[in-house]
Curated annotation (Swiss-Prot):
Gene3D superfamilies: Urate Oxidase. It holds the Pfam family GCHY-1. Converts GTP to 7,8-dihydroneopterin triphosphate. Pathway: Cofactor biosynthesis; 7,8-dihydroneopterin triphosphate biosynthesis; 7,8-dihydroneopterin triphosphate from GTP: step 1/1. The record marks 150 as: May be catalytically important. It comes from Vesicomyosocius okutanii subsp. Calyptogena okutanii (strain HA). This is GTP cyclohydrolase FolE2. HAMAP family: GTP_cyclohydrol_B (MF_01527_B). GO terms for molecular function: GTP cyclohydrolase I activity. Belongs to the GTP cyclohydrolase IV family. The lineage of its organism: Bacteria, Pseudomonadati, Pseudomonadota, Gammaproteobacteria, Candidatus Pseudothioglobaceae. InterPro entries: GTP_cyclohydrolase_FolE2, GTP_cyclohydrolase_FolE2/MptA. Its EC number is 3.5.4.16. It catalyses: GTP + H2O = 7,8-dihydroneopterin 3'-triphosphate + formate + H(+).
Amino acid sequence: MSATHLPDTQNSADTRHIIIDKVGIKDIIHPITYIDCDGNKMPTIGMFTMTVSLPEHVKGTHMSRFIEILNENSCEFSAHNFDQIIDKVKEKLESDTAHITLNFPFFRKKEAPSSGVKSMMDYQVTLYGTLNKGEVQVMIKVVVPVTSLCPCSKSISKYGAHNQRSHITIKAKVSKGRTLHIEDLIDLAERKASCELYALLKRDDEKMVTERAYDNPAFVEDLVRDIAVDLNADDKISYYCLESENFESIHNHSAYALIENLKC
């Protein structure tokens, strides 16, 4: 029997009359190319979750069409063009709502502060795209690892201060008609930290980053407040959720702070 004569069970009627808010595929891994703010193309691996709503009278969605969308397209993404794949899901799945999440490692080449030796630094990035009532919204989340050094420890200790790796997480909704780059959020987080991280450091670099952190102590509260000042002033961002988790080197727990702001 040819495919054209096989029954299409998904399109059959459903008598329970219950709308499904989200149905689709979750955590499918697919190669992608990310285009950075300078137009450079970076091959990486993305994990997608793609869903649509399902009317009460339809039995099932067409799961294979989500995969077809990934296979038919070049899978070249940037924060600026992410809304295009949402439109493709809407058209191919014939739905009024669509939700897409793309999670991937993003790499930047960084120079060590003294020796200038270059290495690749990785950041975990998530793009969120939502279509609802004809409006497309895009959000960017980036996790930026940094160094934080305790101001209290510095003030009371003769020989140094405890410091640790911290994760600053910024989730930002892009204002309508504006472009927000991943690099903008990474630069902001690293600029406000006690010191940024590098994959490769020589001895003179290690001396420099250690002293830089000592000269720029910051509580977890300082980190989120300093970053929030800049996020509040950035009209490319209409909403943000900002977190910092410090993996305390002298405790078996983390210090944590969060600021959330719906700007408009």
